[in-house]
Amino acid sequence: MTKKIVLQIAYQGTSYSGWQYQPNALSIQEVLETILKKIAGFRISVISSGRTDAGVHAQGQIAHFHCPDHPHFTDPRQIQKMLNALLPHDIVIHDAVMTDGDFHSRFSAIAKEYRYTLSLLPKPLPHHRLFCFSPRYKLNIARMQEAAQYLVGTHDFASFANLGREYSSTIRTLYTLDLSEQEHLVTVICRGNGFLYKMVRNIVGALLDIGKGKYPPEHLLDMLATKDRRKGPPSAPPYGLSLHHVCYPPPYQWFCKHEHNNSSEGK
């Protein structure tokens, strides 16, 4: 069986068109594949757990590639060192492992965690400005937290899925949707078995409407019931969002920070 190298990747998405290769813009995937080609002498395709959008960051993106028959690709630690030596400053390989199983970065995943950071300051601090969104109006965090709980569980999230994409199903399960406040920053922690296109940013956009008093917390129940994205609020900007963690079942828990209580979590 062909061996695979699995990478845990962090990146600042500010300068990129997203994860996926784009013909007229620079992507994270293109940068990685270009460097792997430089090392191996031929093209190597890198497959990720999911496609982050333009401007979205990652702390724990997972990607894999089939290990070529090449002397530079026998030791995952050496591969990590070589990649980090050649990658730009805004992409880092946190870890690398080798597997000979049926692991697939996307299809083996059982849960993902995204985090969206909000600044409560009118103007974010310089070292935060690329990683958080400042709505510049007062937010009632308690009401946002109350509203968030209406979305926890298994629901049809059609109202939170951007138009223009075809989905085999818009039903997803959120295990956690919490707000954590620390000084002038609020982090929206969203963990689920899978996410629709721009789903997290659309959820944050809806929570912002609740937080500024436009709607009561129960409005999110109405949004779920309508199943119509056109009646929803604008998406929150991409630069506040980060793919924080991807979780896999045994024996693929190389990078897992915590176990999930529900052993039946889906992909």
From Swiss-Prot:
Keyword field contains Translocase: no
CDD domains: PseudoU_synth_EcTruA (cd02570)
Enzyme Commission number, as recorded: 5.4.99.12
Keywords: Isomerase, tRNA processing
GO molecular-function terms, A-Z: RNA binding; tRNA pseudouridine(38-40) synthase activity
InterPro entries documented for this protein: PsdUridine_synth_cat_dom_sf, PsdUridine_synth_TruA, PsdUridine_synth_TruA_a/b_dom, PsdUridine_synth_TruA_C, TruA/RsuA/RluB/E/F_N
Active-site residue list: 53 (nucleophile)
Pfam family, one: PseudoU_synth_1
Catalytic activity: uridine(38/39/40) in tRNA = pseudouridine(38/39/40) in tRNA
GO biological process: tRNA pseudouridine synthesis
Binding sites annotated in the UniProt record for substrate: 114
Family to which this protein belongs: Belongs to the tRNA pseudouridine synthase TruA family.
Function: Formation of pseudouridine at positions 38, 39 and 40 in the anticodon stem and loop of transfer RNAs.
Subunit structure: Homodimer.
Record-given protein name: tRNA pseudouridine synthase A
Taxon lineage: Bacteria, Pseudomonadati, Chlamydiota, Chlamydiia, Chlamydiales
